[in-house]
């Protein structure tokens, strides 16, 4: 055993990590109560709304039918939080992800603080400054939940060998089951691969093969249960949909396709600051030559192996999205903060200076960015005086902290974290919700339809695309009709309410439809949309 600290200090670290986790949770949920639902969140909120009306199920539902791409685990969490309120809102939808993100903060600190509390705190800072972590934390993110599971599995394996936590290994397989329940097969494979990479680098062959084989057997059992539940929920056809969407579709590119190096190149921006700085740290370690690694450096190498495995493993399927490799981010953050753990080496000193410079200047850089953004969105960003004042105060505090040796590392990092999160919560989120608003138009449409009930036809919205963004604001069991072509639309019988884009309306040639004056016009997901009332002709 290589205990990094005596048990008493480990107890102190546990309390400190819980405190940091609670502070992070407050940051993650501040200002989030009844935000408008936009983008990818619409799908999961619609799942929860239907579950709130009809009760729990194995798979989430849309339009009353089971949805094949996910199990209902995350929807169940939102449902449980929404039941006392009687409604689903942004707070109940986001809270499970926020808790998972806070759990990641706790584990990152517990991994690194036994070597140096400064390393632990600055690893958290690098995590909180990473762009995809920020956007996914304040959203419904199954991949963020999976990142928490994967890091927990890695932590249990590492703590067993280094922190004397042998009794906790029995949690490994329940965590793998939880990962599968959240994210399907990939939710079990990624945490398994992360721990297997640790055993491989550590040359623990017996643990590698025993854990790997048991995880493989567990994967087979979970897949069998998944297909059984699919057959019970929707029959043979639905089971085939589950196989296509959760297995084959991601592998063969039918769900989207990107290049093999997509994750390695796009992460330079999507996972800045942690990922690009982590690459520089690894280059500095390699340039330092071969030497016997101390426990802290070994942790860095274990994290590098785990992060690399996640990126390589997820590069195999054709379908790739930036959020899929979130389990890599905590590892990258730990590596990126490593220069503050070592005291020797010119390259590490240069990296410390680089990071301190970025942290210190970030409030000013954000002010410059907001000035540029206001030129593009003058109406939405006209009132930025308070934000500029806050960033100015944080800039002054960062400079003052930089001048004091005791605060030199922590002060600028804290100022940078507060600056970027304040900017995101106060400026970026409202701007996104203004530009991509779907609630205003949808609620206005619902009001008109309730005044004169008739079938609703969604033309050109896509049953699993913009229609979801419309129905999440409708929040009722009314199942609309869907049309994609003008020929299908021409078959619709009056009376009916027609929802379509302004462009689709102007391209109609059917005289019966083209002559209708729009009842309502408004912005929907950054595009002009219209509501038409197709009235039944009165008999002569």
Where are these regions (language model features)?
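Membrane-embedded architecture of ER/inner-membrane glycosylation machinery
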Residues: 288-540
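Start-transfer (signal-anchor) and selected internal transmembrane alpha helices
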Residues: 1-28, 214-218
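Extracytoplasmic catalytic/substrate-binding loops of multi-pass membrane glycan-assembly enzymes
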Residues: 33-50, 56-59, 65-77, 87-91, ...
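Specific aromatic-rich, kink-prone transmembrane helix
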Residues: 107, 126, 146-162, 332-335
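Transmembrane-lumen/periplasm boundary regions of multi-pass, lipid-linked membrane glycan transferases
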Residues: 44-50, 174-175, 182, 187-321, ...
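Transmembrane-helix motifs of polytopic, lipid-linked glycan transferases
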Residues: 95-115
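Short acidic/glycine- and proline-prone juxtamembrane loop motifs at membrane-interface regions
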Residues: 90, 94, 135-146
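Membrane-interface transmembrane helices that cradle and orient dolichyl/undecaprenyl
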Residues: 113-118, 153-169, 340-343
């Amino acid at each position: 055993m290589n205990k990094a600290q005596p048990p008493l200090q480990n107890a102190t670290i546990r309390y400190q990590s819980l405190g940091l986790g609670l502070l992070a949770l407050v940051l993650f949920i501040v200002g989030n109560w009844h935000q408008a639902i936009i983008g990818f969140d619409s799908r999961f909120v619609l799942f929860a709304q239907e579950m709130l009306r009809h009760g729990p199920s194995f798979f989430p539902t849309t339009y009353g039918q089971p949805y094949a791409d996910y199990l209902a685990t995350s929807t169940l969490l939102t449902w449980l939080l929404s039941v006392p309120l009687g409604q689903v809102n942004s707070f109940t939808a986001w809270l499970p992800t926020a808790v998972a993100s806070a759990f990641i903060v706790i584990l990152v600190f517990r991994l690194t603080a036994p070597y140096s509390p400064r390393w632990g705190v600055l690893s958290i800072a690098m995590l909180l400054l990473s762009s995809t972590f920020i956007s996914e934390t304040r959203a419904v993110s199954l991949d963020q939940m999976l990142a928490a599971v994967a890091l927990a599995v890695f932590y249990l394996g590492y703590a067993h060998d280094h922190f004397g936590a042998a009794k906790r290994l029995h949690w490994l397989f329940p965590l793998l089951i939880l990962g599968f329940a959240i994210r399907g097969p990939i939710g079990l494979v990624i945490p398994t691969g992360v721990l297997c990479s640790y055993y491989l680098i550590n040359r623990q062959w017996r643990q590698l093969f025993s854990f790997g084989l048991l995880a493989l057997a567990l994967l087979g059992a979970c897949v069998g249960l998944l297909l059984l539940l699919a057959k019970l929920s929707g029959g043979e056809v639905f089971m085939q949909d589950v196989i296509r969407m959760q297995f084959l579709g991601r592998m063969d590119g039918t769900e989207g396709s990107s290049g093999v190096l997509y994750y390695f190149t796009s992460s330079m921006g999507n996972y800045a600051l942690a990922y690009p700085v982590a690459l520089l740290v690894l280059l500095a370690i390699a340039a330092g030559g071969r030497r016997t690694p101390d426990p802290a450096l070994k942790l860095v190498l274990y994290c590098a192996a785990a992060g690399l495995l996640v990126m390589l493993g997820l590069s195999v399927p054709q379908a790739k999205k930036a959020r899929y490799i979130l389990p890599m981010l905590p590892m990258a953050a730990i590596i990126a903060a490593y220069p503050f753990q070592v005291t020797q080496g010119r390259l590490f000193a240069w990296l410390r200076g680089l990071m301190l410079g970025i942290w210190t200047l970030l409030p000013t850089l954000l002010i410059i960015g907001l000035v540029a953004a206001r030129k593009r969105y003058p109406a939405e960003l006209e009132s930025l005086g308070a934000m500029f004042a806050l960033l100015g105060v944080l800039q002054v505090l960062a400079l003052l902290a930089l001048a004091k040796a005791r605060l030199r590392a922590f002060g600028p990092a804290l100022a940078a974290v507060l600056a970027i999160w304040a900017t995101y919560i106060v400026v970026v989120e409202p701007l996104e919700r203004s530009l991509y608003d779907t609630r205003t138009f949808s609620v206005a449409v619902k009001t008109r339809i309730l005044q004169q009930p008739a079938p609703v036809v969604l033309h050109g919205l896509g049953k699993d695309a913009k229609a979801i963004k419309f129905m999440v604001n409708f929040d009722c069991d009314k199942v609309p009709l869907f049309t994609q072509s003008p020929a299908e639309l021409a078959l619709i019988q009056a009376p009916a309410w027609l929802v379509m884009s302004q462009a689709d309306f102007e391209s109609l040639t059917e005289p019966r439809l083209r002559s209708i004056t729009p009842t309502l016009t408004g912005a929907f997901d950054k595009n002009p949309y219209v509501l038409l009332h197709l009235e039944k002709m009165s008999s002569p």
